[in-house]
Amino acid sequence: MPSTRDIRRRIKSVKNTAQITKAMQMVASAKMRKAQQAALAGRPYATLMNEVMAAATAGAGEFQHPLAEKREVKKRALIIISTDKGLCGALNTNLLREAAKVPPATTVYVVAGRKAAQWVARTKRELVAEFSFKDSPQFAEARAISKFAQELFLSGQVDAVDVVFTNYINTLTQKAEVRPLLPMGRIKKLEANLSGPGTSEDLQPGSASEFSFEPAAGQLLGNLLPHYLNFQVYQVLLEAKASEHSARMVAMKSATDNAKQLIKDLTLEYNKLRQANITKELLEITSAAMAMGN
């Protein structure tokens, strides 16, 4: 049985841990709000961009573009968007479990985030590029990833490019998913609003009558495709950061709550042990007094 000194030492240790997790919770909460606002603010633009792309595709007729060329998939590139740090619950575990479903023998890996890089190295998979991005992702960072993916596809090194990331749904819910990027015909249409994640469905040619294109839709589409891909990657980075900070805030709150409960339990155990020691001492004193009286 532990002594009162051991319990006091453990209570002090847990209190110190609770202070750390509480501070991390507050930092994550501040970052979470900013990241969530950025992710949600980008969704209306992403939705409108899809509508424009669908309308331009309808107006372009038989449109041909190197980024839309469909080939037999012999080699695939998988872009993994992970976190740099841990302490965010099962977020990275779920993400990498989804990435592991892609057959590694026919896949090369592009990573953004240290956790993904460590996983690729640990599992001895083929890494072709590693990127990093800030807590507030910049469009230039997304463009660098997108440009590299386009170069892989256009050079014929890969026949398809997918991205696996954690999609932000709400503060308590984040979902790891694989989204196709190239060829462009495999892009998903995202219908989203500011209050929810939206739904994904295949991008289909829309009604060109809603838009008037100058110059011709085909010419515009050729210039629009690279920007469209850049923004898709940028939105993925925003969703990943919103998911990371939300998961970390929830994890740190849970850790703080658990620490507080543990402190209560230890304090109760300490008081019981202290009371037992006092009772034992009183009994010894009483027994000694009675023995001396006799």
What are these regions (language model features)?
Residues 1-294:
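C-terminal beta-strand-loop-alpha-helix "lid" module of Rossmann-like NAD(P)-dependent dehydrogenases
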